[in-house]
């Protein structure tokens, strides 16, 4: 095997396992690409960490593939394939063990609906218009799925995919790529005579970047956790979880480590204290409690989803009810505009402190 082949194999492993090359084994493997090095010493601990990482990624990919297959059959969008003789497996090498065999990708259901959603959303974010339309998170998801699965519009997907990162500028494109991108955009919008240039592309990309960075899309996410202990076939309740995990909860002990003592430093500088109070004065205490309860809501929803537990509105409302005793004893001033009487439900009302 030549040095170029070895480098290609190592680069393939890097893209599959550790794209940023943060593991310790990469400098040791790259020594094989040198013509002057006759012997290569590989650290055992680095090799074991590399193999453990490979095993975990393989287990995660296998679990995700099984979940996708089960979801497809549960939704009625897939049928059992006909039995066919399995082809002979190709010869496996050390560097080609993780290369997956090519498989036919399942066709999406009703791609015309995905195309219509993508065309409507991109047309709204690309062209100058005075009308306003309502879009949902599913419209953005359908647009990205359609662009990613369509070969003709895959270059447009790559451009919008970079908007998910913290990049302020679009990537550099050649003249051929610019011409192909503009032709692709005109074809998708079905407006061959509309003047479309790179300014239109920049407006579209910046609009999608703001859309991807919105709190609605950032909080509406699916978290995949490793292991099979986080999934349940049947939905449970909070009371059942407390009974099931009561023994483990009782065994928990508070743990705290103080590095340099627990004394609170004393400040005798009145000017600094007054300046600090001026910074804290615009932020009422009730607003701090509201932000904390809001953060607890998102964390609670994620924990409920992981445990497949039924969400009870009254359990969440106890967070605000427990803070009402503090609010009753607080001084009510005219500047206080935030309060804690916010409950979930159809009859929820918001009161203002006067």
From Swiss-Prot:
- UniProt main location, coarse: host cell
InterPro entries named among the record's database cross-references: AcMNPV_C42 (IPR008562)
Q: Which residues belong to the signal peptide in this entry?
A: none
Keywords, alphabetical: Host nucleus, Late protein
Per the annotation, the residue ranges of the short sequence motif Nuclear localization signal are 349-352
Do you know which Pfam families this protein is assigned to?
AcMNPV_Orf101
Per the record, its GO cellular-component terms are:
host cell nucleus
Cell location: Host nucleus
Hey, which family's this protein in? Belongs to the baculoviridae C42 protein family.
> What is the name of this protein?
Protein C42
Q: What does the organism's lineage look like at the top?
A: Viruses, Viruses incertae sedis, Naldaviricetes, Lefavirales, Baculoviridae
């Amino acid at each position: 095997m030549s040095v170029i082949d070895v480098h290609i194999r190592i680069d393939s492993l890097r893209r599959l396992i550790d794209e940023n090359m943060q593991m310790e084994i990469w400098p040791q493997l790259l020594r094989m690409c040198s013509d002057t090095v006759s012997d290569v010493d590989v650290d055992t601990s680095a090799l074991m960490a590399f193999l453990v990482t490979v095993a975990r990624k393989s287990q995660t990919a296998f679990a995700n593939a099984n979940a996708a297959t089960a979801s497809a059959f549960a939704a009625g969008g897939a049928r059992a394939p006909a039995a066919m003789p399995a082809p002979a497996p190709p010869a496996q090498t050390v560097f080609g063990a993780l290369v997956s065999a090519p498989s036919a990708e399942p066709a999406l259901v009703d791609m015309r609906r995905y195309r219509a959603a993508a065309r409507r959303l991109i047309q709204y974010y690309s062209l100058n218009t005075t009308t306003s339309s309502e879009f949902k998170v599913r419209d953005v998801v359908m647009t990205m799925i359609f662009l990613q699965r369509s070969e003709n519009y895959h270059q447009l997907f790559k451009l919008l995919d970079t908007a998910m990162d913290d990049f302020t500028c679009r990537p550099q494109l050649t003249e051929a790529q610019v011409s192909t991108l503009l032709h692709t955009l005109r074809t998708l919008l079905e407006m061959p005579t509309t003047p479309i240039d790179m300014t239109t592309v920049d407006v579209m990309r910046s609009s999608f970047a703001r859309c991807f960075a919105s709190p609605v899309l950032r909080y509406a996410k699916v978290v995949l956790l490793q292991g099979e202990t986080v999934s349940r076939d049947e939905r449970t309740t909070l009371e059942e979880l407390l009974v099931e995990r009561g023994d483990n909860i009782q065994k928990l002990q508070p743990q705290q480590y103080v590095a340099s003592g627990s004394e609170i430093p004393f400040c005798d500088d009145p000017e600094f204290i007054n300046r600090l109070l001026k910074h804290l004065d615009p932020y009422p205490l009730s607003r701090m409690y509201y932000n904390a309860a809001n953060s607890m809501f998102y964390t609670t929803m994620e924990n409920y989803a992981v445990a497949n537990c039924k969400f009870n509105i009254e359990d969440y409302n106890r967070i605000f009810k427990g803070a009402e005793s503090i609010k009753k004893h607080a001084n009510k001033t005219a500047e206080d505009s935030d309060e804690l009487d916010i409950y979930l439900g159809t009859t929820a009302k918001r009161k203002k402190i006067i």
